[in-house]
Amino acid sequence: LYDVVDGENGRDDCACRPNQIFAISLDHPILDQARWQPVIQIVKDRLLTPVGLRSLAPGEHDYKPRYDGDLRARDAAYHQGTVWAWLIGPFVDAWLKVHPDDRASAAEFLGGFRSQLRTACVGSISEIFDAEPPYTPRGCCAQAWSVAEVLRSLVKTRGGREKVETTNELSSVTVA
């Protein structure tokens, strides 16, 4: 899906970004259901990492694999590849709409956060990560929206149970 239509100078932006997942994940999706599967597949193949979704796919113009350097360099990378942990929530929502009987795969998408609970800020999840391995945590080391979306997704993948033993359940997730 285009990220921007009728943008600057009338140009459409066809860069692969995570915004397209919202067209499916919303309570009332705005994308025709016949298009859900291809969007999910593209996001899974090009944007999904063990710690969230990249803000821009590798190979796209201006892609930045690392969020480092001086302030100007970090600002340039912020939305050009940097992984946002909180985006795992909308991805899991969309995945479960397309694959309602595949909670196991949805749970596996959360497996990369297991190690994050023991690094950066123990018991929490960082705001952002580098876009390439080893997915170094960056930004705020204890980001509320990152934690909230991982926990919300964990509850969804466990069939909606309200009580979740966070550390134990995340630790039980196997990652391929």
Where are these regions (language model features)?
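Catalytic cores of carbohydrate-active enzymes
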Residues: 1-66, 115-147, 173
